[in-house]
Amino acid sequence: MNQGTIIKVVGPVVDVEFPSGLLPNINNALHISSDEQPEDKKTGHDFKVVLEVAEHLGGNIVRAIAMSSTDGLMRGMVVTDQESPITVPVGDATLGRLMNVVGDPIDEAGEVPSETRWPIHRSAPTYVQQNPSKEILETGIKVVDLLCPYVKGGKIGLFGGAGVGKTVLIQELIRNIAYEHGGYSVFAGVGERTREGKDLLVEMRESGVIDKTSLVFGQMNEPPGARMRIALTGLTVAEYFRDEQNQDVLLFIDNIFRFTQAGSEVSALLGRMPSAVGYQPTLATEMGTMQERITSTDKGSITSVQAVYVPADDLTDPAPATTFAHLDATTVLERSISEKGIYPAVDPLASTSRILDPRIVGEEHYEIARDVQEVLQEYRELQDIISILGMDELSDEEKLTVARARRIERFLSQSFFVAEQFTGNPG
């Protein structure tokens, strides 16, 4: 087994020297375990730190990024090259379980009993293997299926502020895919608040969708290496269900912006020259490498729903702008709609879909969707007049438009199965 020694530790960055001719490859996993240390380096407490090789510095030295805290590491400690990238458990054993970036369970329910482990760095399906789908993924959510339908194997951006219903919408999607399609879901919490992750886990257990879901979390308090790689861990779990079990999988990434943010931190730690607005120069490459793995193949599909945080509401910021290039549909949640008590609070005019096309959804569906948007657009234009002068100042035709629009709004709202315990209304 190839072993080296630590020669420098600066925060989450660790430099390791290996014997001549035995340098580990880029992206290889390195393990530092308390069991393998010489007597003079034993600290009295057990630990296991996983590093990932990021650079070869010359002179048989590699620079690696830690996936957990480097507290307790010191120069001279023994490091073991695993001779492969980080591997994580995959398969049915991961369903209902909560794991971290290196596949260790963090739900205190014992080891994940999976015999199969896959590396998190994998190549995207080839041209021949890809099977671009034009098939609609029926979600059972009226406003989505009518106005911004999701494509099987597509990527959907979910935009929304705090408290407008992103989490409930995600849970309903997971529930509907599990019950109506018999499919599996994978939830990757990227730079999540730990409290929100805990809430989601409890709610999933109560609503009964946990048995069809694998969860992987790299919380806000984790080092940037873990937050940068946790999306790949979730994606690898989803790829196994797609490629080995021929499943149509739903992959949730919340929040894709944190993936970019963590990459920016790692880039700065490695001393790379920053690009526009301080982001890493490899931003487009990192995003593309991950997004290209989310696709339909001749075996199954991965449909991805990604929550997108927009810094300072600036859509031209390089992080959201790079994400937009990969999306097939956008679902925008609007606070003004949730304030009316209309849930899901999807904005029917701001939400878009690439497959809302008469050649794919059919002429009738397309015409109805456009007519609905036309009525809602007219209603929006009349709202200023209504708020200032009142309904009495409208013409009979305009009053009819308002009545139609309000009925459409109510029709496009619905009770969710997963919210039944809170609302008392059946889904």
UniProtKB/Swiss-Prot annotation:
Record-annotated disulphide pairs: none
Residues annotated as binding ATP: 160-167
Listed InterPro entries: AAA+_ATPase, ATP-synt_VA_C, ATP_synth_F1_bsu, ATPase_a/bsu_AS, ATPase_alpha/beta_chains, ATPase_F1/V1/A1_a/bsu_N, ATPase_F1/V1/A1_a/bsu_N_sf, ATPase_F1/V1/A1_a/bsu_nucl-bd
Keyword annotations from UniProtKB, A to Z: ATP synthesis, ATP-binding, Cell membrane, CF(1), Hydrogen ion transport, Ion transport, Membrane, Nucleotide-binding, Translocase, Transport
Bilayer topology: Peripheral membrane protein
EC main group: translocase
The reaction(s) this protein catalyses: ATP + H2O + 4 H(+)(in) = ADP + phosphate + 5 H(+)(out)
One function term, GO molecular function aspect: ATP binding
Keyword Calcium attributed: no
Alphabetized Pfam families for the sequence: ATP-synt_ab, ATP-synt_ab_N, ATP-synt_VA_C
GO cellular component, one term: proton-transporting ATP synthase complex
Main location (coarse class): membrane
Assigned EC number: 7.1.2.2
Keyword Glycosyltransferase annotated: no
Location of the protein in the cell: Cell membrane
SUPFAM superfamilies listed in its UniProt record: C-terminal domain of alpha and beta subunits of F1 ATP synthase (SSF47917), N-terminal domain of alpha and beta subunits of F1 ATP synthase (SSF50615), P-loop containing nucleoside triphosphate hydrolases (SSF52540)
SMART domains from the UniProt entry: AAA
Subunit structure: F-type ATPases have 2 components, CF(1) - the catalytic core - and CF(0) - the membrane proton channel. CF(1) has five subunits: alpha(3), beta(3), gamma(1), delta(1), epsilon(1). CF(0) has three main subunits: a(1), b(2) and c(9-12). The alpha and beta chains form an alternating ring which encloses part of the gamma chain. CF(1) is attached to CF(0) by a central stalk formed by the gamma and epsilon chains, while a peripheral stalk is formed by the delta and b chains.
Protein family per UniProt: Belongs to the ATPase alpha/beta chains family.
Protein's job: Produces ATP from ADP in the presence of a proton gradient across the membrane. The catalytic sites are hosted primarily by the beta subunits.
Stated name of the protein: ATP synthase subunit beta
Lineage, highest ranks first: Bacteria, Bacillati, Bacillota, Clostridia, Eubacteriales
